UniProtKB/Swiss-Prot annotation:
<keyword id="KW-1017">Isopeptide bond</keyword>
<feature type="modified residue" description="Phosphoserine">
    <location>
        <position position="17"/>
    </location>
</feature>
<feature type="compositionally biased region" description="Basic residues">
    <location>
        <begin position="35"/>
        <end position="51"/>
    </location>
</feature>
<feature type="modified residue" description="Phosphoserine">
    <location>
        <position position="104"/>
    </location>
</feature>
<feature type="compositionally biased region" description="Basic and acidic residues">
    <location>
        <begin position="1"/>
        <end position="27"/>
    </location>
</feature>
<comment type="similarity">
    <text>Belongs to the RSRC2 family.</text>
</comment>
<keyword id="KW-0597">Phosphoprotein</keyword>
<keyword id="KW-0175">Coiled coil</keyword>
<feature type="modified residue" description="Phosphothreonine">
    <location>
        <position position="16"/>
    </location>
</feature>
<feature type="modified residue" description="Phosphoserine">
    <location>
        <position position="32"/>
    </location>
</feature>
<dbReference type="Pfam" id="PF15477">
    <property type="entry name" value="SMAP"/>
</dbReference>
<feature type="compositionally biased region" description="Basic and acidic residues">
    <location>
        <begin position="66"/>
        <end position="111"/>
    </location>
</feature>
<keyword id="KW-0832">Ubl conjugation</keyword>
<dbReference type="InterPro" id="IPR028124">
    <property type="entry name" value="SMAP_dom"/>
</dbReference>
<feature type="modified residue" description="Phosphothreonine">
    <location>
        <position position="6"/>
    </location>
</feature>
<protein>
    <recommendedName>
        <fullName>Arginine/serine-rich coiled-coil protein 2</fullName>
    </recommendedName>
</protein>
<feature type="modified residue" description="N-acetylalanine">
    <location>
        <position position="2"/>
    </location>
</feature>
């Protein structure tokens, strides 16, 4: 009986060991990818446990002390395995290797074959599963990204269609409103209330919509119809206004000029009739306002009348009467007349007659002298009919001029080494002969 108890006790912990080993394998797989490297050691631990079962069945004849020691050893191994699996996986593998060395002497060849088969199976299964999982996750991500891009495209196209439909509906509403307003203006009062209510409702709806649409609606006003025609009409109206203003200004200027001319005529008439004081009095009596300009014009007109009475010369109308002194202007006009009037026949003086009758004894010399003095050649005919006294004087003059010329030529020949003789009226040889 005692032996049977010991066998049961020995078998119980051994039966529980495969469950714990399965849990350990699951924890090792889920902990880290590094654990996948140690599939070989796990397969060894499984074969070890099976061999233990077979050994314990064959060792039923062993003593109770041996079973107690085994129990203690296994309980210690369990506690150490739990701690090691949670904290350090490397220590567990080292303890498994030690157990493998103890049991390696029993069935070496079978154990190696089983290990190789299981390790290859475990590795292949784990690697294929991880690859399948990765492939599935990647395909799912691709499908999700494709579906997202499709959703985005659909949402964009929908938003565009909505915008287009809204703009079309707005244009239709505007056309309908413009037509209704043009047709039914006399019914405006009855329909204005309903329109205002509907507009307020539309505004509320627009406010409830996203903000960007309301902004775009408020910022873009409805285009006015026939904008080009309005601009052309505006330009024509502006031109017409400018022409009207120019006409008005021209009329005002013409009126001012007419008034000034009238004032000047009045001032001239007043100056002709009497003094400036009387003229101003006459203007005051007539009812016209006397300005400083009118007073100055009256004074200048009085001065002009005075100069005209003294000299008989009037200042022309194209001169400014305020800028021209009438007395000085009269003196200048007298001088001009004296200069430009024609000479009379009986106004020759005695000196003029003497210079005209002057004779140098040479015709060429006489002609040159008369040209220089401005004496006309018509008087040559009158020179023949001269008195005896005048004839004597003319002869004396000729002799004097001849003697002077001869002396001058002699002096010139001596001092200037015959560079030139005389004034050019006579030859050098003739002067030398006379000497």
């Amino acid at each position: 009986m005692a032996a049977s108890d010991t066998e049961r006790d020995g078998l119980a912990p051994e039966k529980t060991s495969p469950d714990t080993d399965k849990k350990k394998e699951q924890s090792d797989v889920s902990v880290s990818p590094r654990a996948s490297k140690h599939h070989y050691s796990r397969s060894r631990s499984r074969s070890r446990e099976r061999k233990r079962k077979s050994d314990n069945e064959g060792r039923k004849h062993r003593s109770r002390s041996r079973s107690k020691e085994a129990r203690r050893h296994e309980s210690k191994d369990k506690s150490s395995k739990k701690h090691k699996s949670e904290e350090h996986n490397d220590k567990e593998h080292s303890s498994d290797k030690g157990r493998e060395r103890l049991n390696s002497s029993e069935n070496g060849e079978d154990r190696h074959k089983r290990k190789e088969r299981k390790s290859s199976r475990g590795r292949s299964h784990s690697r294929s599963r991880s690859r399948e999982r990765r492939h599935r996750s990647r395909s799912r991500e691709r499908k999700k990204s494709r579906s997202r891009s499709r959703d985005r495209k659909k949402s964009r196209s929908r938003s565009r269609e909505r915008k287009k439909s809204r703009s079309r509906s707005r244009e239709r509403k505007r056309r309908i409103r413009s037509r209704s307003r043009s047709r039914s203006r006399h019914r405006h009062r009855s329909r204005s209330r309903s329109r205002t209510r509907s507009r307020s409702r539309d505004r509320k709806k627009r406010i409830e919509k996203p903000r960007r649409f309301s902004r775009s609606l408020s910022r873009t006003p409805s285009p006015p119809p026939f904008r080009g025609r309005n601009t052309a009409m505006d330009a024509q109206e502006a031109l017409a206004r400018r022409l009207e203003r120019a006409k008005k200004l021209q009329e005002q200027r013409e009126k001012e000029m007419v008034e000034k001319q009238k004032q000047q005529e009045i001032a001239a008439a007043a100056a002709a009739t009497g003094g400036s004081v009387l003229n101003v009095a006459a203007l005051l009596a007539s009812g016209t306002q006397v300005t400083p300009q009118i007073a100055m014009a009256a004074q200048m007109a009085a001065l002009q009348a005075k100069a005209l009475a003294e000299t008989g010369i009037a200042v022309p109308s194209y001169y400014n009467p305020a800028a021209v002194n009438p007395m000085k202007f009269a003196e200048q006009e007298k001088k001009r007349k004296m200069l430009w009037q024609g000479k009379k026949e009986g106004d020759k003086s005695q000196s003029a007659e003497i210079w005209e009758k002057l004779n140098f004894g040479n015709k060429d010399q006489n002609v040159k002298f008369r040209k220089l003095m401005g004496i006309k050649s018509e008087d040559e005919a009158g020179c023949s009919s001269v008195d005896e006294e005048s004839y004597k004087t003319l002869k004396q003059q000729e002799e004097v001029f001849r003697n002077l010329d001869a002396q001058y030529e002699m002096a010139r020949s001596q001092t200037h080494t015959q560079r030139g003789m005389g004034l050019g009226f006579t030859s050098s040889m003739r002067g030398m002969d006379t000497v």
